[in-house]
């Protein structure tokens, strides 16, 4: 008992030091004193491993390497916020809420950190899961990396399940230090944070000193918190890092003044922000205000006015996209813009270049449109010389040299050669992307290599790639047996993605992810959409004449119909997936946790999809006391079976997914 008490006391002391150092930025002891106490704890734990505490600072150390991150559905969807680009919109937002609720409300203003959103789950006081935002419905569990962030508590004094959300980021100073030592620097701090958080080796995360701020608790009423201010106070009490730049206001005029002042001083912060979030403080009115189809009505993001910087335009890169559209991109002298090193900016199309009279070697003003894509705003004409020559118009496709066309009422030029190699490559790359069929393991470089070697010349060829294993392994792609099998598994899994993702991946002009999902509400499958008349298409709420014509023409093109037939022949499902709210809740498998081991007649990914749709299950790679069932196939891992037996976890040997 004496050793337990000694270890517990050291853990609490180190946690206190960590909180003051990483959260309050107020060190209590020197690094030497901290290290000595840490080494004392390590020695005690090595001598008594059975006494290691789950919240011990030694449990944060990186070095865990995982093959992949497991995906899990969010308990509550992680929605985006609607944006306001001026203070008048914010004032209107506040007035509308006050009118609807009938009272003068308090509003909380929080910095919108330019980082990576994270959702932490604590069970019985212990941090058990850390999900990225993902698509808002499903995220990746990056717990092994999050545990290396020393400002995040591993335990909290609350013994029910609770979800806590925040933002993980890299501060400006750390970003500059890390980039100094990289052969290929990160373009911005957000990319560095995202890449670090998704690195499969947690040792990388431990070295990069990620930071975090927390600001939201879904279902906060279960904590007894009746306002956002109370949530932030509770988070501070639990030693979570909360931004000092949070403020609250009873008067709209004072809030607006704060927004304007913050915009002028934000560069003084040591972290990148891309706006401020204005939230209604009182939770009592949240249900009354509700949500739009995309956003909560009780919060709004105020986006800062774009900043402008000056640089030299050294050249123009002309490329062709999957639809044949020609893109003009300015090649710039590198310049820092809003925390990002920018060396390229969009010029849109040649009409834009002519309208702005942009020339080679001009000094130009660039800015970030919506804080995302750099654009060329204008030319600094007083700095122009006679040596600045006009940019020539592209008349032929830069990839296949086919003549370009410009359609009536459009400003863009197009390559109409359907056999253009670059167009086909971009089309395949888009088809496998996360927003479309989500086939993992295929970069544009890999696709290009497969294309050059006649292994993948169209999206249909992806589904025959398993027949060319030897040829793929022979290429210099750094793809071995294990990665090849994972790639094939991901390709096979994509067959079940359904109509919306397939429609997105086909790259039909004017049909993106949102419209594709909308079409599945009106047509039960691709065949029904293919049979739709122009009149039927024009009756749809999200379809105008241009989109209707594009859809109708695509589905009446012989080449496209042959493509659909070939995809159907290899087993790609073309029905609209219905969201399953009719789980088998009476089953013993409903919402249980599974480990899958061994081989089966169908892929593990397919099994997981079937079990999720039927029982709303969860999955993990390791057998622990938190696992409910082990699903064992042929040649199941003996160690996992032994662990299951030791923990009295049922082992299933039958196809429960059918």
Curated annotation (Swiss-Prot):
A Pfam family this chain is assigned to: BRCT
GO cellular component, one term: cytosol
Residue stretches making up the BRCT domain: 584-654
Residue stretches in coiled coil: none
Gene Ontology molecular functions: DNA binding; DNA ligase (NAD+) activity; metal ion binding
Role played: DNA ligase that catalyzes the formation of phosphodiester linkages between 5'-phosphoryl and 3'-hydroxyl groups in double-stranded DNA using NAD as a coenzyme and as the energy source for the reaction. It is essential for DNA replication and repair of damaged DNA.
Family of the protein in this entry: Belongs to the NAD-dependent DNA ligase family. LigA subfamily.
Stated name of the protein: DNA ligase
Gene behind the chain: ligA
């Amino acid at each position: 008992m004496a050793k337990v008490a000694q270890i517990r006391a050291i853990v609490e002391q180190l946690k206190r030091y960590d909180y003051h150092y990483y959260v309050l930025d107020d060190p209590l002891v020197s690094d030497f004193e901290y290290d000595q106490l840490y080494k004392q704890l390590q020695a005690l734990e090595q001598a008594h491993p059975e006494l290691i505490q789950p919240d011990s600072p030694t449990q944060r150390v990186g070095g865990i390497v995982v093959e992949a991150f497991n995906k899990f559905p969010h308990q509550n969807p992680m929605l985006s916020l609607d944006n306001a680009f001026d203070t008048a919109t914010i004032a209107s937002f506040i007035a509308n809420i006050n009118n609807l609720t009938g009272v003068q409300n308090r509003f909380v203003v929080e910095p919108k950190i330019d980082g990576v959103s994270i959702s932490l789950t604590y069970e019985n006081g212990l941090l058990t899961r850390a999900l990225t935002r993902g698509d808002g419905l499903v995220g990746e569990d990056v717990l092994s990396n999050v545990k290396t962030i020393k400002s995040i508590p591993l335990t909290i004094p609350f013994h029910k399940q609770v979800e806590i959300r925040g933002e993980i980021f890299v501060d400006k100073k750390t970003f500059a230090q890390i980039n100094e030592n990289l052969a290929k620097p990160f373009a911005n701090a957000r990319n560095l944070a995202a890449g670090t958080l998704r690195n499969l080796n947690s040792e990388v995360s431990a070295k990069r000193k990620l930071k975090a701020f927390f600001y939201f608790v879904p279902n906060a009423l279960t904590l007894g918190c009746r306002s956002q201010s109370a949530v932030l106070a509770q988070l501070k009490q639990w030693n979570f890092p909360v931004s000092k730049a949070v403020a609250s206001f009873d008067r709209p005029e004072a809030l607006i003044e704060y927004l304007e002042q913050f915009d002028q001083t934000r560069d003084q912060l040591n972290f990148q922000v891309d706006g401020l979030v204005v939230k209604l403080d009182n939770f009592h009115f949240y249900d009354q205000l509700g949500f739009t189809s995309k956003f909560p009505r009780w919060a709004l993001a105020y986006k800062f006015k774009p900043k402008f910087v000056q640089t030299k335009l050294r050249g123009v890169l002309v490329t062709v996209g999957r639809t044949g559209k020609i893109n003009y991109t300015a090649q710039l002298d590198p310049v820092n813009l809003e925390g990002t090193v920018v060396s390229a900016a969009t010029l849109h199309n040649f009409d834009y270049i002519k309208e702005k009279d942009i020339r080679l070697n001009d000094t130009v003003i660039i800015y970030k449109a919506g804080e995302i894509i750099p654009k060329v705003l204008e030319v600094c004409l007083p700095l122009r010389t006679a040596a600045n020559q006009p940019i020539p118009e592209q008349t032929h496709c830069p990839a296949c040299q086919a003549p370009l066309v410009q359609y009536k009422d459009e400003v863009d030029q197009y390559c109409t050669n359907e056999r253009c190699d670059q167009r086909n490559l971009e089309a395949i790359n888009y088809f496998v992307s996360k927003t479309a069929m989500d086939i993992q393991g295929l970069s544009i470089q890999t696709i290009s290599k497969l294309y050059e070697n006649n292994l993948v010349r169209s999206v249909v060829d992806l589904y025959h790639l398993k027949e060319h294993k030897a040829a793929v392994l022979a290429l210099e792609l750094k793809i071995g047996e294990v990665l090849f099998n994972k790639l094939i598994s991901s390709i096979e899994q994509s067959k079940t993605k359904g109509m919306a993702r397939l429609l997105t991946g086909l790259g039909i002009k004017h049909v993106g992810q949102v419209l594709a999902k909308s079409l599945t509400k009106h047509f039960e499958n691709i065949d029904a959409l293919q049979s739709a008349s122009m009149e039927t298409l024009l009756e749809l709420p999200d379809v105008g004449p241009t989109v209707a014509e594009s859809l109708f023409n695509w589905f009446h093109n012989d080449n496209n119909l042959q493509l659909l037939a070939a995809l159907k022949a290899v087993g790609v499902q073309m029905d609209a997936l219905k969201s399953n709210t009719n789980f088998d809740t009476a089953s013993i498998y409903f919402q249980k946790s599974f480990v899958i081991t061994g081989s089966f007649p169908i892929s593990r990914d397919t099994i997981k999809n079937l079990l999720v749709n039927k029982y709303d299950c969860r999955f993990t790679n390791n057998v622990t006391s938190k696992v409910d069932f082990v699903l064992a196939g042929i040649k199941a891992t003996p160690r996992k079976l032994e662990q299951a037996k030791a923990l009295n976890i049922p082992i299933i040997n039958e196809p429960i997914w059918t």
